[in-house]
């Protein structure tokens, strides 16, 4: 428990040394994508011919390939579709990087909200918002910086309308002290 608290304090200290307009990692720290260690879920699984290549876990496979039919993207649809990663422990998160589907349908992600928190109440939709995805080009990879460091175990991408949500990669960025 003490080690986790010390790590959390180091993360917060590192985050506070960042300039508000800078995406640079401060000296003495490394940025790591902790989503690779997590477990992903989504509100619905695509059915039919492409069901086997649209799993939630495809969005945390470390592959930014944005062509859906290569099998590296998630796909969920319906009323208020959502995708979520359980990071399996609490982290102090500075930003989330998303790769949008590139072979078509880039506009479908517009209006999605990135939520971060420690609770699964209402499928994580009640957790605080890091950012909203207003417009994102097909195949674009973009980092969404939270207005302040956010503490959470669950990162949810939620589309508050009837539609389709494609995510080809989701990276959850955390700062750690660099090894000596």
From Swiss-Prot:
<feature type="binding site">
    <location>
        <position position="61"/>
    </location>
    <ligand>
        <name>Ca(2+)</name>
    </ligand>
</feature>
<dbReference type="GO" id="GO:0045088">
    <property type="term" value="P:regulation of innate immune response"/>
</dbReference>
<feature type="binding site">
    <location>
        <position position="58"/>
    </location>
    <ligand>
        <name>Ca(2+)</name>
    </ligand>
</feature>
<dbReference type="GO" id="GO:0042806">
    <property type="term" value="F:fucose binding"/>
</dbReference>
<dbReference type="InterPro" id="IPR051941">
    <property type="entry name" value="BG_Antigen-Binding_Lectin"/>
</dbReference>
<keyword id="KW-0430">Lectin</keyword>
<keyword id="KW-1015">Disulfide bond</keyword>
<feature type="binding site">
    <location>
        <position position="169"/>
    </location>
    <ligand>
        <name>Ca(2+)</name>
    </ligand>
</feature>
<dbReference type="GO" id="GO:0005615">
    <property type="term" value="C:extracellular space"/>
</dbReference>
<dbReference type="InterPro" id="IPR006585">
    <property type="entry name" value="FTP1"/>
</dbReference>
<protein>
    <recommendedName>
        <fullName>Fucolectin-2</fullName>
    </recommendedName>
</protein>
<feature type="disulfide bond">
    <location>
        <begin position="104"/>
        <end position="105"/>
    </location>
</feature>
<comment type="subunit">
    <text>Homotrimer.</text>
</comment>
<feature type="binding site">
    <location>
        <position position="108"/>
    </location>
    <ligand>
        <name>alpha-L-fucose</name>
    </ligand>
</feature>
<feature type="binding site">
    <location>
        <position position="101"/>
    </location>
    <ligand>
        <name>alpha-L-fucose</name>
    </ligand>
</feature>
<keyword id="KW-0106">Calcium</keyword>
<keyword id="KW-0479">Metal-binding</keyword>
<feature type="binding site">
    <location>
        <position position="75"/>
    </location>
    <ligand>
        <name>alpha-L-fucose</name>
    </ligand>
</feature>
<feature type="binding site">
    <location>
        <position position="72"/>
    </location>
    <ligand>
        <name>Ca(2+)</name>
    </ligand>
</feature>
<keyword id="KW-0732">Signal</keyword>
<feature type="short sequence motif" description="Cell attachment site">
    <location>
        <begin position="101"/>
        <end position="103"/>
    </location>
</feature>
<dbReference type="Pfam" id="PF22633">
    <property type="entry name" value="F5_F8_type_C_2"/>
</dbReference>
<keyword id="KW-0964">Secreted</keyword>
<dbReference type="GO" id="GO:0005509">
    <property type="term" value="F:calcium ion binding"/>
</dbReference>
<comment type="similarity">
    <text>Belongs to the fucolectin family.</text>
</comment>
<dbReference type="GO" id="GO:0001868">
    <property type="term" value="P:regulation of complement activation, lectin pathway"/>
</dbReference>
<feature type="disulfide bond">
    <location>
        <begin position="130"/>
        <end position="146"/>
    </location>
</feature>
<dbReference type="InterPro" id="IPR008979">
    <property type="entry name" value="Galactose-bd-like_sf"/>
</dbReference>
<feature type="region of interest" description="F5/8 type C-like">
    <location>
        <begin position="31"/>
        <end position="179"/>
    </location>
</feature>
<feature type="binding site">
    <location>
        <position position="168"/>
    </location>
    <ligand>
        <name>Ca(2+)</name>
    </ligand>
</feature>
<feature type="disulfide bond">
    <location>
        <begin position="73"/>
        <end position="168"/>
    </location>
</feature>
<feature type="signal peptide">
    <location>
        <begin position="1"/>
        <end position="22"/>
    </location>
</feature>
<dbReference type="GO" id="GO:0010185">
    <property type="term" value="P:regulation of cellular defense response"/>
</dbReference>
<comment type="function">
    <text>Acts as a defensive agent. Recognizes blood group fucosylated oligosaccharides including A, B, H and Lewis B-type antigens. Does not recognize Lewis A antigen and has low affinity for monovalent haptens.</text>
</comment>
<feature type="binding site">
    <location>
        <position position="63"/>
    </location>
    <ligand>
        <name>Ca(2+)</name>
    </ligand>
</feature>
<dbReference type="GO" id="GO:0030246">
    <property type="term" value="F:carbohydrate binding"/>
</dbReference>
